[in-house]
């Protein structure tokens, strides 16, 4: 979602691609919806086939070049993934329409990088745009919570199907013929030096399905192989994005829920606090301790540390109004991380969150706009808010990719 906002901010609001923006605006909203839906379905299908097979559509001198049959197979990834994404966005859309808000149909953002041999999922997601402000905390709550809960339900149903219809090991051996000689014990032999292989993390939903739903445990793929299984990979990504959207920060869906339940005063304290903790975790373990007397890499480490400080500062530069306060916060974060790195060198966060934190701090913001009608929520909505918190815990993975 944050990447989408970056895309919108750069290409639309800042007019860096003004002619393209005007061309898109001239298309009717319904035609634009179906056009971008079709393009994004194609790009996610291309990406899905690449993940399933471990090959690309272009000859880069190694591996097999994909063909037409692989494209049709890629639909096993794209259709459920785009389907869940659509359910999520229309959850927002229908509740916005219910409250007579001026809202756009979902806009899908295609992004396929296989032509340069980079892995991608074929899309940067989708978003709706509210052209008018919602009037009450209740409206913000209903619009905010509808998307992730709808998407979560779709993801769970997809994963139930995926885990109850796992293919035999021959499916994986067709992707990696070199594993076949090890049989069901392949994981004990082929990951001694995993190198640049991508490993999916875990979450409580996956743990539940693996431990209590799958009857033949030998069919459960290793974390390094999950992306070859389109239903599992699409479901994992759906849970990942659901968790991101439910972070109780700024104007993410979770931020709307936090604001709706507790009001602006609590949100203005809790949201920036959680954001700072998020940035702290993302860059935990990054500072490079320096021995000024004996360190042979003194210059490199100094530059690395200055770079880390710069990234943290850019991320938190809108927490306070005064730049000096943000600089003090930055140095405090870095200083504590530095001390922890000295005394607990194995303690690390997840650097993959850094870009997300940058986009959240710089483009979406961590505060929430006010509303005209500031009354609290009903007991039923409070219960749904607690349910959304449970959903967040079930979906969240501290290290989603490794």
What is each model feature region?
Residues 1-402:
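Hydrophobic transmembrane alpha-helices and their immediate loop junctions
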């Amino acid at each position: 979602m944050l990447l989408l906002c970056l895309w919108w901010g750069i290409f639309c609001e800042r007019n860096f691609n003004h002619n393209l923006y005007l061309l898109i605006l001239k298309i009717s909203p319904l035609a634009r919806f179906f056009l971008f839906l079709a393009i994004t379905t194609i790009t996610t299908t291309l990406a899905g086939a690449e993940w399933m097979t471990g090959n690309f559509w272009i000859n880069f001198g190694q591996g097999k070049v994909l063909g037409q049959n692989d494209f049709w197979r890629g639909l096993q990834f794209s259709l459920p993934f785009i389907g869940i994404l659509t359910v999520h966005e229309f959850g927002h859309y229908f509740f916005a329409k219910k409250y007579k808000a001026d809202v756009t149909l979902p806009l899908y953002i295609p992004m396929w990088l296989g032509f340069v041999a980079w892995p991608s999922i074929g899309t940067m997601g989708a978003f709706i745009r509210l052209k008018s402000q919602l009037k009450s905390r209740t409206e913000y709550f209903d619009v905010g919570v509808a998307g992730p809960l709808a998407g979560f339900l779709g993801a769970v149903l997809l994963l139930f199907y995926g885990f109850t219809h796992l293919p035999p090991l021959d499916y994986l051996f067709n992707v990696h013929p070199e594993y076949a000689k090890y049989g069901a014990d392949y994981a004990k032999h082929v990951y001694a030096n995993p190198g640049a292989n991508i490993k999916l993390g875990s979450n409580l939903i996956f743990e539940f399905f693996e431990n209590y739903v799958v009857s033949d445990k030998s069919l459960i793929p290793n974390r390094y192989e999950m992306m070859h299984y389109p239903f599992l990979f699409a479901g994992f990504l759906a849970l990942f994005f659901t968790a991101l959207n439910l972070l109780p920060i700024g104007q993410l869906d979770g931020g709307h829920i936090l604001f709706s339940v507790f009001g602006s005063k609590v949100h203005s304290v809790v949201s920036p606090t959680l954001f700072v903790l998020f940035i702290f975790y993302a860059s935990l373990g990054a500072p490079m301790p320096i021995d000024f007397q004996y360190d042979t890499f003194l210059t490199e480490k100094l530059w690395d540390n200055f770079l880390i400080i710069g990234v943290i500062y850019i991320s938190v530069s809108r927490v306070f109004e005064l730049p000096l306060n943000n600089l003090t916060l930055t140095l405090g974060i870095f200083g504590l991380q530095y001390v922890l790195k000295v005394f607990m060198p194995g303690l690390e966060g997840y650097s993959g969150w850094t870009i997300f934190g940058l986009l959240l701090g710089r483009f979406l913001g961590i505060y929430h706009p006010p509303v005209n009608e500031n009354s609290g929520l009903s007991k039923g909505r409070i219960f749904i808010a607690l349910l959304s918190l449970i959903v967040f815990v079930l979906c969240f993975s501290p290290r989603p990719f490794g």
